[in-house]
Amino acid sequence: MQAGVSVPHYQGMAGELQPLPVLIITSVALLVTGVVMISSASMDMAAATLGNSYHYVIRQILFAGLGCATALVAVNVPVSWWERSGWLLLGIGLLVLVLVLTPLGRTVNGSTRWIPMGLFNVQVSEVAKLCLIAYLAGYVVRRREELLHTWPGFLKPLGVLGVASVLLVIQPDFGATVVLVTAAAGMIFLSGVRLSRFMPLIGVLAALGTILVVTQPYRLKRVISYLDPWKDQFDSGYQLTQSLIAFGRGEWVGVGLGNSVQKLFFLPEAHTDFIYAIIAEEFGLLGALVVLGLFAALVVSGLVIARRAEKAGMAFGACFSYGITLLIGLQAGINMAVSTGLLPTKGLTLPLVSYGGSSLMVTCIGIAVIARVELERQDRARVASETKGNRTKGGAVYD
C-alpha cells in the first residue's frame, strides 16, 4: 500500500449510506429470493420428470453454498492478482469457448453451451465473460493513452471481443454475446473514450445482428413472435404469451407463494429463464418491482464503488468494477425485459435468482471482486488519513 495517496475519507461519515453494505445485503436478498422461488417454481416439474419434488431446490441450495464459499475466497484475492493475470484469464476465457465446441460440450435444446463437470454443467459463457472483462480492464489501464487517442488502440480490444463473439454465436449463445459486447463497450466508454468512436461499431453490430436474425429461422421466429406474440400463441409466441399471462394473473399483490398456475407445465423454463414471471404471478406487480429495486440498488452500489475507486487512483479496480456491474445489470435487465415482452427471447438467466450453478458462482465471484475493490479503497483512505494525522500532529511539521 502507498501511504502517501491522498483520497477523501468516505467511511464513517454521518448519515452517508455506504455502498458496500448495500451491495452485500441486496446480493444476499436476491440469493434467498432465488432459492425460495426455485422451490416454488420447480417442485411440480421435478416431481413429474425426476420423481423428486426437491431436486432443483436442493441443488440450488448447494450452488448457493458453493457460491458463498467462492465469494469468500475471491474477496481475499488482491485486486492486483486479477490485473497481473490478464493474459492468463484471456487464455482461459477463449479456451473454454473453444472446448465447448468439441465433443466435450453438451448440447441442450439445440445449443452447445455447457461442459459437464460431474456435479453440474459449466456454462462456459459465464466463465468467459468474467475472464474477458478482467483482461479488457487491464488493457484499458495499460494502454489508456493509445486507447483514447488512436484507432489501432481502440480496435485491438474490439478484435478480442470479435473472436469471443464468434465463438459464442457458433454455440449459439446470442444473448451472452449481446451482454458481453455491451458491457465491454460500456466499460471502455466509462474509461474516457469519446462516444463518437463507438458510432461505426454500433452500425457494424446492428448490421451483423440483422444478418444473424435473418439467416437463422429460430431467431427470426423469435423476433416475429416478439412483435406480435398472440398471433402465434401456440407456437413461436407460446413462451412469451404464457409469461404475460403470469404477469396478468399476479395483478398487484399476486396469488401467493406456491399458488402459481403457470408453473404447472404452462410456462417453459419457469425456474430458469422465466422465473421473473413466476415472481410476478405469486407476488404481483409489487413483488416484481421489489426484485427490480434490489437489482437497481445492487447496480448503483457497484457503480458507486467503481467511481470511488477511480477517484482514489485505483484505475484497474475501478474499470473492473464497472465491467462486472454492467455484466450483472445488463443480464438482469435483459432477462426482466424478455419476461415482460420488451425484448425478444434471449435465453439468459436472472443473476442470483434463476436456477443454475455456474451462473450463480461466477456472479458471486464478481460481487466479491467489487467488494474487494471497496475494501482496498477503504484501506488506502485509512492509511492516508493516519499518515496525514501523524504529519500534522502537534500543529507543525519539522524536518
UniProtKB/Swiss-Prot annotation:
The chain crosses the membrane at residues 19-39, 61-81, 85-105, 114-134, 160-180, 198-218, 285-305, 314-334, 350-370. GO terms for cellular component: cell division site; plasma membrane. It is a multi-pass membrane protein. Pathway: Cell wall biogenesis; peptidoglycan biosynthesis. The keyword Manganese does not apply. Its EC number is 2.4.99.28. GO terms for biological process: cell wall organization; FtsZ-dependent cytokinesis; peptidoglycan biosynthetic process; regulation of cell shape. It is found in: Cell inner membrane. It is an enzyme of class 2 (transferase). It catalyses: [GlcNAc-(1->4)-Mur2Ac(oyl-L-Ala-gamma-D-Glu-L-Lys-D-Ala-D-Ala)](n)-di-trans,octa-cis-undecaprenyl diphosphate + beta-D-GlcNAc-(1->4)-Mur2Ac(oyl-L-Ala-gamma-D-Glu-L-Lys-D-Ala-D-Ala)-di-trans,octa-cis-undecaprenyl diphosphate = [GlcNAc-(1->4)-Mur2Ac(oyl-L-Ala-gamma-D-Glu-L-Lys-D-Ala-D-Ala)](n+1)-di-trans,octa-cis-undecaprenyl diphosphate + di-trans,octa-cis-undecaprenyl diphosphate + H(+). It comes from the Bacteria. Keywords: Cell cycle, Cell division, Cell inner membrane, Cell membrane, Cell shape, Cell wall biogenesis/degradation, Glycosyltransferase, Membrane, Peptidoglycan synthesis, Transferase, Transmembrane, Transmembrane helix. One of its GO terms (molecular function) is lipid-linked peptidoglycan transporter activity. Belongs to the SEDS family. FtsW subfamily. Peptidoglycan polymerase that is essential for cell division. This is Probable peptidoglycan glycosyltransferase FtsW.
